[in-house]
Amino acid sequence: MKNDVVRWSRQPTSNTTNSSSSSRSDSNSTHKHRSKSNKLNARQLGSNAARSCQQRSSVATTLEDEQQTIIECDIGNFNFDCNLFKTSFLTQHKQKRSGKSSSKSKSNRSRPLAKTKAVFLLALQFSAVVFLCNINVGFVAGSVATAASSAGGSSPAAPSSAPSSPPTVAVPPPPPPSSALKVDPNGQSPVLPPYVLDYETGGKAKLTPNNGKFGQSGSSGSNNNHIVGHYTHTWAVHIPNGDNGMADAVAKDHGFVNLGKIFDDHYHFAHHKVSKRSLSPATHHQTRLDDDDRVHWAKQQRAKSRSKRDFIRMRPSRTSSRAMSMVDAMSFNDSKWPQMWYLNRGGGLDMNVIPAWKMGITGKGVVVTILDDGLESDHPDIQDNYDPKASYDVNSHDDDPMPHYDMTDSNRHGTRCAGEVAATANNSFCAVGIAYGASVGGVRMLDGDVTDAVEARSLSLNPQHIDIYSASWGPDDDGKTVDGPGELASRAFIEGTTKGRGGKGSIFIWASGNGGREQDNCNCDGYTNSIWTLSISSATEEGHVPWYSEKCSSTLATTYSSGGQGEKQVVTTDLHHSCTVSHTGTSASAPLAAGIAALVLQSNQNLTWRDLQHIVVRTAKPANLKDPSWSRNGVGRRVSHSFGYGLMDAAEMVRVARNWKAVPEQQRCEINAPHVDKVIPPRTHITLQLTVNHCRSVNYLEHVQAKITLTSQRRGDIQLFLRSPANTSVTLLTPRIHDNSRSGFNQWPFMSVHTWGESPQGNWQLEIHNEGRYMGHALLREWSLIFYGTTQSIGPNDPISVPKPSGSEATTPNSSSTTSNLHQAYSPQYPRIPPNNFGSSPSGGSKLPLGKVPPPNKSSYVTNNPLLNSAPPKQGYQQISATYGVILGKANGKSNNNSKEKTNNKGNKSNNGNKGKSGGSSGNRKEQTTQSTIIQTSTSKNKYYRISQQQQQKNNKQDRNGVQTQRPKANSGEKSYDEKSRKVVGEITTNSGNGSIKAAKQVKESTTTSSNSRIPKLFERYEKIQAIFPELEPYENSSPKGKPKQAKQGKQFEVDLFKPTNGGNSRQGNTKKSPSVPPPSQTMATLSILPILPAGGSSFLPDQKILKKQQLLMAAAGVMAPAQVEVEMEEVHATPDYEARKDQRKEVNGPNAQITQWDMIFYGTETPAQPDDVANPSQSNQFNLYGNDMAHNDVEYDSTGQWRNMQQVGEVGMTRDHSNTAACLKWSDRKCLGLSLLFFMIMQVFFLNFKHANDNNNKNKNNIIKCIR
């Protein structure tokens, strides 16, 4: 029984049954007698009353004797038949209600009273549960002792709904064993194991009896019907030197069957006498393998939940259009070639594969394997390119990957993906593969129980023959799963990238996921956020973000796929020798990327797996992809959380690959922050800073991982942001409304590729938001940063993001300053969580596997995973590549007054004004200490702050995050602060294009010898930072006569891309600042009207005419000298006598003014003035209910609303979510709690009044009986 409260109750005695039956018959006769006569004599009434009292006491005794054990209280479904507390008033009154409802001789006046009381009690229970849920109190009542019973016996005390028949006590029959529990045929105990919350089960209690998984057979073609988390009859066994027949001997001695080799010295065993689906491990067989000296390690395999990443369309898409198409550019006679818009659309709106084909690049000689549910090898469009050496059936353990056919064709996924890659061209049938000259194979591994051994064996299939592995599946995209590859699959990734393709590394391409509707984040998928895989996202026909797409920082690039209603989909092969035009989801994107990778490998066979990733980053096209989260990283590359670095360009990748030189050896540097144990209260956030100065082996970043150990009352309330030293803002984790797990994260690696090419040296900031409610505290235990990259640059012209800090480096006692390359040991990428989450050893196998260290080569990796022969590092400060001096918001070190170099490390800033501070010393320092600073911003500062408080600081100190600006001491010629002026670049947010641009506030200081009498008095005390136009510097800098004027090295004009976030996020999501660049030239510094532009990046430059008109208006108002209006905006390069003329102009001109406020007023009409006027097409996209999730998806504004209704499933899921965060999302905290308390108090009042009235009725009834007697 699914999602219901399950109870066990013992059988009542025969006397009770007879009493119940007699009560039913007597009650019926009494009812008939009342309907016939209007009078009752005193003797008859007294007899009925005495009998009623006797039977009421008998029923109450029976109810008290029944012992009921609650299996689970499902609060999510609001089932209120569970005893929260056995001695609570709810249970007592419920038993009283049950006893009274079983009475035979109730009067007409007492029946409606009992019904009213039952309604009030039910409302009272509802109020109590809502109150407990709102204050985030979780509980589990009863003990897990047995399994579910039938639906009819789930509520034994439920009153009858029919008013004609009196209620009776329902006694449930004993549940049959088949419906209660799946009993192991080996005679193992049917008692369920305790709840197991670990990453192996996706962070969910898969073994609970109310999840509907037990007892279901499940068809072989439907992966979702399999029992998730159960123990299978297979083992993974490590037998050193097992190839000489020892593995077969071990299997035979212990009754196993050797299914084959997984990879080096690891074998796949099966025992046919063990149940294929068991709730408990087969400890007897596990012990026998552990006691065998020939076996180094063995572990029984458990099933994993893996889903295919496509979806079913409600109706087919529209047909293809030949407008602006390059269909005729290639003479293909395949019937579906005109409809393959993503290959032949032209105009820069396709994958640009036709130019590569014209160069003779078709993927010939490259082998691609599809890891999926099988491959129809005899398909007319696949059989010519089918490669049997690249195929295997892991589910049935044979060489034929043919899929299992069923009524719904559920195993068509692999055949569709294979057709995208290598469908035969010019065969007058179906489609054309993007690499139609490549060889393709298939691995059938999703059509059965998917275990760690099954995944590892699929990923390790013939790595010297197969070049590319394409996978369009992964953990459930339900918005609440956190899962990744197990220990064997992780080892398979490492083996493939280090030894595959003759040492150049196998290429693993993965679909990013289809959990966008559930607001899932692909950084919770351990396959897509792995450094070994190339994660691919999707774009619609119009270049929008699909409604199913997930956003995360690990996505590297994008290919086309399906979109909304009316947009075209992907054409490919299908089961039964057919063709389809409706392949969908990110499942269709990954095979297209695999086909492009095959073209690139044909052009250069010497490319490594890292070379391909570098080529993708350098050639991806951000153009024509619409997403508000586009930003520039520290080296000027555009990157997005939805599209990665952009759309893959096949022809450009082939061109670059032909002349590509192999990248240097990849280095690895890990920095372990000290143990923090930092509590994060609800609705707050903390900022942690980690300064990196010792990772000398990594100067150019590729991948960055943030390993975090964190616990939370609700994992979905956690948000993570990372900011690099080059001010690249990365969103590591977004809120997940369906994730109610309390297991948190245990050393989970959140990966980012957004800092590709930057330098790791400098201050890194990790910002953790807790959007929980009330008592939903979070606790950060530890975190670390892992940098992957190279020591030397890849190209001679690659930009440098952040220069290395100068000065000597000091080391603290609790750290070490060593770096490690890839040949040294490091912690496993995806550690396993023990069942109890307290560090106990995992089940199965007391021995650790023994691995061989691969010989040194490019990209060589050795891990301390149990599968390798290296001891795990000790807990603490192993492999620390930086030193730590823990400070609290203050600079560590003294500044040098002679310094001309400043380091400006800006902290993360939230919407409510919280600012993180980071300090540091500038100039040449004798001693330099790396800082690990924890900054908790719990107070809010007003945006209007006193200027007078900013003027008491010393000269030449760093500007700390734009909050406090230290200005030099006043000279003797300065009278007071009122005679000083400040250059202020304010903070402004403008809507331009698809995103919002926010200029960071900057304060530039200068002094003047005369007072500005026209400045309002208000701005002598306050500055309205966010209301000042950033491009106009209202004050001119005038130097004293006779002193040389130095060019001022002001701060850059920094641009933030503002991305609004859904829910109660108190932080601006995905803010992106421009990189740090060399200071502007003297001409740019002295020209006060021109904005300071960042090198190599675009900036918001106001229109010249607008600025000139503004100057004319200011001159007409008398606030600007007329001579200053003559300054032309085009005058960028100053003449030699420019400074002299400027100083002379300043002496003649009057005092300057400051713009205090500016507004824009629009006058117009809502509709066109004339019926023939063309409507503005952009107005339909101005309002968006989805925030930025669907801001550029035109299906959002479909006139029919049909596809809009399907996309609203995500919002419906929000309303159906019974968690406290989703339930109270529409109301504020106080309103939600207040309404619950008010409802609870009202119910209590009704209950007390009703109880008082009932007591009075009982007293009156007793008085009547006494009078009759």
Curated annotation (Swiss-Prot):
Pfam families the UniProt entry points to: P_proprotein, Peptidase_S8, S8_pro-domain
Cofactor section: Ca(2+)
Enzyme Commission number(s) of this protein: 3.4.21.75
GO MF annotation terms: serine-type endopeptidase activity
PROSITE patterns associated with the record: P_HOMO_B (PS51829), SUBTILASE (PS51892), SUBTILASE_ASP (PS00136), SUBTILASE_HIS (PS00137), SUBTILASE_SER (PS00138)
Disulfide bonds: 430-579, 522-552, 669-695
A cellular component annotation (GO) from this entry: trans-Golgi network
Keyword Nucleotidyltransferase carried by entry: no
GO term, biological process aspect, one: presynaptic membrane organization
Ranges for domain P/Homo B: 662-793
Domain of life from the UniProt record: Eukaryota
Biased composition (Polar residues): 38-57, 858-868, 1005-1014, 1062-1074
Residue ranges constituting the Peptidase S8 domain according to the UniProt record: 340-654
UniProt-annotated location(s): Golgi apparatus membrane
CDD domains named in the record: Peptidases_S8_Protein_convertases_Kexins_Furin-like
Keywords for this protein: Cleavage on pair of basic residues, Disulfide bond, Glycoprotein, Golgi apparatus, Hydrolase, Membrane, Protease, Serine protease, Signal, Transmembrane, Transmembrane helix, Zymogen
Record: glycosylation sites: 15, 18, 28, 108, 333, 426, 606, 727, 814, 857, 897, 908, 994
Biased composition (Basic and acidic residues): 975-985
Membrane disposition: Multi-pass membrane protein
Function of the molecule: Furin is likely to represent the ubiquitous endoprotease activity within constitutive secretory pathways and capable of cleavage at the RX(K/R)R consensus motif.
Name under which the protein is recorded: Furin-like protease 1, isoforms 1/1-X/2
Organismal lineage: Eukaryota, Metazoa, Ecdysozoa, Arthropoda, Hexapoda
